[in-house]
Amino acid sequence: MRTLKTFALASAATLIATAAQAAPTTWAYSAKTGVGASYEAYVDGAYKAGGKTGAVSKVWFSIADGVLTETMYGLIHEAQIKQMRIAVETASGLAIEGADTTAKTEYLHVDAAGRPLSPAYKITTTDRQGRFVIEKRIFTDPDRNALFVRVTVTALKGAVTPTLLLEPHMANTGGGDMGAASASALTAHEGKAFLSLKASKPFAKASASVLKDGDALAALKATATSAKGAIVLAGELPKVAKSETFDVVIGFGADAKAADQTAAATLKTGYAEVLARYNGEGAHVGWEDYLASLSQLPRLRDASEDGGKLLQASALMLKVQEDRTYAGALIASLSNPWGDTVDATKSSTGYKAVWPRDFYQCAMALAALGDKETPLAAFHYLPTVQVGPKTPGNTGDGGWFLQKSHVDGTPEWVGVQLDQTAMPIMLGWKLWKLGWLPDAELKAFYGKMLKPAADFLVKGGKVNLDWNTATITPPFTQQERWEEQGGHSPSTTAAVIAGLVVAGDIAEAAGDTGSAALYRQTADDYAGKLEARMVTTKGTFGDGHYYLRLNSDQDPNNKSPVEARNGQAPVAEDKMLDAGFLELVRYGVRRADDPAILASLPELDDEALEDLYRVRYSFKFPGVEGSFPGWRRYGVDGYGEDTQSGANYGANNQMRPGQRGRVWPIFTGERGHYELALAGLSGKPDPAALAKIRQTYVKAMELFANDGLMIPEQVWDGVGADSAHAYVRGEGTDSATPLAWSHAEYVKLLRSVSDGQVWDNYAPVKARYAR
């Protein structure tokens, strides 16, 4: 929902007065309205210098509440900055961006229809008392490790004095930094990570101080020019009588000299030239060129309801959120969920990491756009996160894919999720059938990656990695797609069946007919037992006949308790509704009019259920006719804000019974895909059916996006207290924005509508089970 953000976190004066209650060091607010990085062209499928975009820039930035927030340099998860705000001294007192301003996010470079052409932003923060306006233009230098911010301060009620307040989090932590300040630069470093902030005009005053009790504003009174620990760097800009523009560059490097020289070089190159290179204007190769390479973009625009604005933003977001050292390493989000209450004293990736499931969604969406290079790079990357003899600490069976890992393949979470082992096979088959993955290469990957994965989906094995010593017996998964429960999961099993069927095709192409037969036979076995394992006929809701979210044993009618998670008390499995069964239709395992599928929809869509169990919610938006559907992950989901206090999920490292997972835009896209499959049972859907899908599901996802065209992980459902952030119903929460999967689902829905058939459907699976 695109609204001007107007809530007040706290005034500058209040922040000073209450700083003693603040956490000493955290990350920033996670509802980003913008993220960006330079477009870098591959050289032989890798990121290295010498290609048409020259040197490789490895800097990413994010924006929230009008403020520059987490900025990464090096690997995509290596944050070096928490935030940079501007404090303004006025005749009537102090004001600080975020607390005392409203914020508006716009794209700096758009086409004639207003569609974004690059992830460069114009951020306008306006003082609530009408004393000043600040405009920031933010982008990176595509030829250097530098961030460029053009700042224009306009005084409206007398002269004002702006001061940059930079909070470094060098080496991805909020402590242990060394900082220094002078008239010419603000600098910080920890380990081998260095930054240097330079401005186009010398600082009138500059200081480096230690953050005390979370009070960054205290730096305005500091006089020291060096500090160590959790630090704040302050640089006072010249007084502004009317309107002044300052260019600010933050350079990064492996040592102080490199960072300083980088900042100076970018500043010397200048705003216009750096921006032109970033955008790809004229002879420069940049973001314009990437968008122009997307062969399907023009026709997908026609399937949108906003003229293609969110589509082009989604294309940018998917490509931005790729590492620039490990080509094809697609992460979940450039955010740390509920970051403003997450302890930053220890390094953490947040969502800036690889989950093969999210990764698959992104690669498939990029393929849907007609990007032939990134999905192939992604496929080539996958052995990096497959468990085998070379996985650090592994002494168990391999073939499965890590639950979550750093982009360099370092294991972070080691649960076994069978859908994450199936999806790499599904991606490989898709790229092969598109004609992008040659037969010879497919056969090579069959031996080294795809066959071990398919074998694990058949036989499972004994895991021995870190804490995990489980014996896996497919299709029973140790964790389903929400990483919380073990059992028979409709969504997981849908992917496993699809993965095995297409693995049969790949094995046959590789000459391994014995394995091909085994994979198909096993898929048939799993498919034949779906309803017996996962459909209850004695459920609590509706007529009692529906798919379970998960069954922890072989009997779907015994009301076994689901394990307690996220602060929630255990409930019987039949009381936990979700839409995971729709994945059976998406992949072709069941027809859209399958009796068990149809029987499960009334319970899923029942808006009369009490909020604890209810999954579907309808939303209205100001000035927009109609209501629009959204769904939670499942009933009794605790992955969200506390309904009693409004506190963030997991605040103070505590799980609370009042926590509640909200509505995820992903599921609006998933339902749109189901409705498309239903409309196409007898052939291509008719125009009226397609129009309804666009006006309902496509439009809803567009409305869930914020003014920066970022689609959140979760949107506020209006249930319970919201004292912390004053969310508007249908607005993104502090969980994670942009979520790459949300953008991927939107793109895939447009491709599916444009094609008149589900993009993620697998023809051999459908031919086998859903004719």
Task: Give names to the regions the model predicted.
Residues A12, P24-E78, L402-G428, S560-A564, ...:
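C-terminal capping/lid segments that line or modulate ligand- or cofactor-binding pockets
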Residues A23-A31, R128-V133, D141-G350, K372, ...:
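Acidic/polar, glycine-enriched structural segments that form the non-catalytic walls/loops
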Residues T25-T125, L195-D213, H284, E288-S304, ...:
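An extended acidic
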Residues T152-T154, L294-A303, L316-Q321, Y360-T374, ...:
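Well-ordered alpha-helical scaffold segments within catalytic/enzyme domains
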Residues T154-L156, G179, A188, Y271-G280, ...:
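Aromatic-rich carbohydrate-recognition surfaces in CAZymes
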Residues G174, A188-K212, D302-L310, G398-T410, ...:
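Extended ligand-binding clefts on enzyme/binding-domain cores
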Residues R301-I331, H380-L402, M423-S491, Q521, ...:
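Active-site acid/base region of carbohydrate-active enzymes
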Residues P337-S348, G399-V416, N464-H488, N557-G567, ...:
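Acidic/His metal-coordination segments adjacent to aromatic residues that form catalytic metal sites
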